[in-house]
Swiss-Prot record:
Domain of life: Bacteria
Single GO term (MF): glycine dehydrogenase (decarboxylating) activity
Enzymatic reactions: N(6)-[(R)-lipoyl]-L-lysyl-[glycine-cleavage complex H protein] + glycine + H(+) = N(6)-[(R)-S(8)-aminomethyldihydrolipoyl]-L-lysyl-[glycine-cleavage complex H protein] + CO2
Organism of provenance: Magnetococcus marinus (strain ATCC BAA-1437 / JCM 17883 / MC-1)
Protein name as it appears in the record: Probable glycine dehydrogenase (decarboxylating) subunit 1
Length: 461
């Protein structure tokens, strides 16, 4: 946005008025070691608008034609052109929070439809109007579960979050609960199946537990034994939180049908539903639950009602939020949601329909199966884990994954995610994702390129 910068005289006048010697003095509470952090020195100097445009255009061209096989929480799907053509209409794009219900019926109804679709996809009774992203949705689900299922007096609330849950999600949850007296425990995964290790889980069999988090599919792309895990948790009085891929739920058993009683809360990342990758955001989180937990649900909820004349209307309801009640009594201190992106997800799901979304999920799975069948024939490549997967597969290489990715990048292929970045000891493991955006020729190209790299002697580099 064009602006006229402050002159030196303007700055001096403002500093003198507030009694401060210099601009740096305004920030003297920041420790010196943070002000001289190496990452700050790497930030480039300001550039003109024209120079910035040239730089960004050049970087955009670098990505042209690159085949993307990276997943690990953010997935490349085809988005019908009509989705963002509609989302960017002024009525959606620039509208603010619909506090005034009588003037916001269109947006309120659209959000209500989002809630209905997500609740239906999860098999749950209700959904909220979205949260920031999948990680914060899981964090809110954990807080929600601890409120609904408090620990015995005198004991610390405990939530089991296995190592198969996305590591970034675990970090965010840890950040949000660290100072709220909640203990997070992370049982390890089974080296054979890539799912939650039952032996590690049973270490807490006789301990009070408030909730168990189950990722489906998990970070490695593997499908967990959700029925066993759900029954294990409920038998011990713990609530079950499912953190799931919404596209996968069109094909797999929904959280509400897990085990004998079903999961209590379902959450996850809604980015696969019509939201571009966009360098990691903005995305949207979703959160749904059973009716019994409705009062613990954070975030906005749109309800449908009748006015005094009997006409249908939509309103914000159950607003137990920090901007409406005392902060200490609020269910959440996240004071906004991703309304625009939830509208995109609504339009995307409406355009695909139940069968269309199921076909997308099925195509993703088939493409990944086909890719693995090709990769299985290569020298120095094997499955890291046994058992079923959805649209990501972890493969073990005879060379370091980072080096292999560098070589693949040289032939314009984003080859996957190096698992060793997050899991020490798995430096040779590559997580490869394949969605409906890939054709058979793309799979062949990837397999041929990887095969050539793996057949070379010595280092992949």
């Amino acid at each position: 946005m064009p602006f006229i910068p402050h002159t030196e005289d303007d700055v001096r006048l403002m500093l003198d008025t507030i009694g401060v010697e210099s601009i740096d003095a305004l920030f003297d509470e920041i420790p010196a070691e943070l002000n001289t952090h190496p990452i700050l020195e790497s930030v480039p100097k300001p550039q003109s608008e024209a120079a910035t445009l040239r730089l960004q255009s050049a970087r955009a061209r670098e990505g042209d034609g690159r085949l993307n096989f990276i997943g690990a929480g953010a997935y490349e799907h085809h988005i019908p052109a009509a989705v963002w053509e509609l989302v960017t209409r002024g009525e959606f794009y620039s509208a603010y929070t619909p506090y005034q219900a009588e003037a916001s019926q269109g947006i309120l109804q659209t959000i209500y439809e989002f809630q209905s679709m997500m609740a239906g996809l999860m098999g749950m009774d209700l959904s909220n109007a979205s949260l920031y992203d999948g990680a914060t949705a899981l964090a809110e689900a954990v807080l929600m579960a601890v409120r609904a299922n408090p620990a015995p007096r005198g004991s610390t609330p405990r939530v089991i979050m296995p190592a198969t849950v996305h590591p970034a999600y675990r970090e965010v949850v840890q950040t949000m609960v660290r100072h709220q007296g909640i203990e997070l425990v992370e049982p390890s995964f089974c080296a054979k199946r890539g799912g939650v290790a039952v032996s590690a889980l049973n270490l807490y069999a006789d301990e009070p537990v408030q909730a168990l988090v189950i990722a489906q599919p998990n970070f490695f792309g593997q499908l967990e034994d959700v029925d066993f895990l759900t029954n294990w948790a409920h038998k011990r009085g713990a609530l079950v939180i499912g953190v799931v891929n919404p596209v996968a739920m069109a094909l797999l058993k929904p959280p509400a049908a897990w085990g004998e009683k079903g999961a209590d809360i379902a959450c996850g990342e809604g980015q696969p539903l019509g939201v571009p990758l966009s360098f990691g955001g903005p995305y949207l989180g979703f959160l749904s639950c059973r009716q019994a937990l409705a009062r613990q649900m954070p975030g906005r909820i749109v309800g449908r009602t009748l006015d005094q004349e009997g006409k249908e209307g939509f309103v914000l309801t159950l607003q137990a939020r920090e901007q409406h009640i005392r902060r200490a009594k609020a269910t959440s201190n996240i004071c906004t949601n991703q309304g625009l992106l939830s509208i995109a997800a609504t339009i995307h799901m409406a355009m695909l329909g139940p069968e269309g979304l199921k076909n997308v999920a099925l195509t993703c799975h088939r493409r990944t199966q086909q890719l693995w069948q090709r990769l299985a024939l290569l020298e120095g490549v094997e499955r890291c884990f046994e058992g079923p997967f959805f649209h990501e597969v972890a493969i073990k290489l005879s060379k370091p994954a980072e080096e292999v990715l560098t070589c693949l990048s040289g032939v314009n292929i984003a080859g996957g995610y190096a698992v060793g970045r997050r899991y020490p000891g798995m430096e040779n493991v590559l997580l490869v994702c394949c969605t409906e955006t890939k054709e058979r020729s793309d799979l062949d190209h990837y397999a041929d390129a990887l095969g050539l790299i793996m057949s070379e002697q010595g280092s992949a580099a």
